Amino acid sequence: MIKKLKFVTLFVGGIAFLSACSDDAFNEIESSLPKDPNYNTDVYTATVSVSNIKEKAIQTNGLSGYLLGKYTQAPFGTKNATIASQVILPSANPRFGALTQADETAKNTPENEKVTEAYLYIPFFNINSSNSRATYNKDTEYQLDSIYGNKDASFAINVSELNYYLSNIGTDYQPKTYYSNDTDIPTHIGTSVASVTSYTISNKSITRYQFDDPKTQDDESKKEADVLAPGIRIPLSTSFFQTKIIDKEGSDELSNAEKFSKYFKGLVISTSNFSKDLMMLLNMAGAKIEIVYSYDTTNNGTKSTLKSRYELNLGGGITVNLLINSDENLSDSAKTYLSGALGQTASITIADTDITKFKEGNWLITDASLYLYVDNSVTYAKEPDRLFVYNAETGNVLVDYQYDPTSAAETAASSYLIHLGKLQKQNGKGAYYQLRITNHLVDLIKNSTNKNIPLGIAVASSVKVTTSGVYLDTSGANHKIALTTLATPLSTVIKDVQLIIHYTKAK
């Protein structure tokens, strides 16, 4: 942080000084500068080796967002994404209606709870998603984030019960990692809970209304209960949730969260029959099941039927993305393939001979940047705006990430512009990415104990996400990866990679 402040202070101070100088002052300064400096400045193109990395499977639990849908981009083929998620009991021993099940039995006053509606709601990401206190206005359109493909596409959604327990502890008693090619989930899909044959997403907020109280003259059903962020909201089977939840009031299955998670193991959400490609990044932290039910009550001898709403959470438990790729054609070994979700990354290694040359030559590195040049012979539906560079052995960010003066910018689009430059375009097409690794290279030269580790390169969904995870290569060995690449289906083909170094050296 201190280094950042020094950089900004010097930069701003320099601007102020230059602004205050007159032309005469500049001439005076120029005449006082040495005519023959005792150093040379030069540019050097270092030798790097680049390897394509094909992911057999990738960790897909513990993510900030989850993909659902279908996306096609030649030559990377078609990506399909399905979501499996636990359902979380918000509190132990829930009461449905005005009385507990024990009181209903003791007083012989059955409330006859009956499910009338049930819904699955999963919000999209939008400009307010990072604010947990954000409120939404009725019938208002919002700018959605991370929707890839055609937003007008229609598609089918199927929701089924999951009959496989998603444990958070593996057989080695360590936190369990779930992979994109998990085989237990697809073979344990149970009863269909919803089947919507044609669905189209909307960027409008979702308004829920209160329930009418027959004891009053007002019609409360016309009043707002709350307004939800734009998202997927589909009807679920009322009979399923009648049996699975409401009829279990007072039972052992609903007595605590652990027993509930083994009783109702979760849901699997899949899509099909797309009119056009559409891949959505969903905010599963805000996902929930809404159960609307009626119940009988007696007040001062007057019987009436009321309605209430009960919610189960999908956020807060284990969620897994199942990812399938098909029709890939990545045959040109001279090119570098980078693809998000279950896809491809690359490994870049700086030649040891060059590292030795930098050390022995006492070079003062002023800038070291990786340039990745885009292959424009490929037609891209949408090009990734950012790439991510990281330590390929640990999955951690480089030192340049920590000292980027734009790191505090509010949005990811405005952050880390020095270290992780945006895609530069020419004639409307992507030309190159510039990834500045100056501090990484300087540390490598100055510190003899630092290892010349390979650098991982991946498509980034957000440069603010620094979490690392695990992927399996084609041999089944596991390696580290930056998980920001998981939350996007976008891809690019790189035709050339160069490490260009600007330096000064004493004469």
Enumerate the language-model features and the residues they cover.
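Secreted, disulfide-rich extracellular signaling modules
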Residues: 2-507
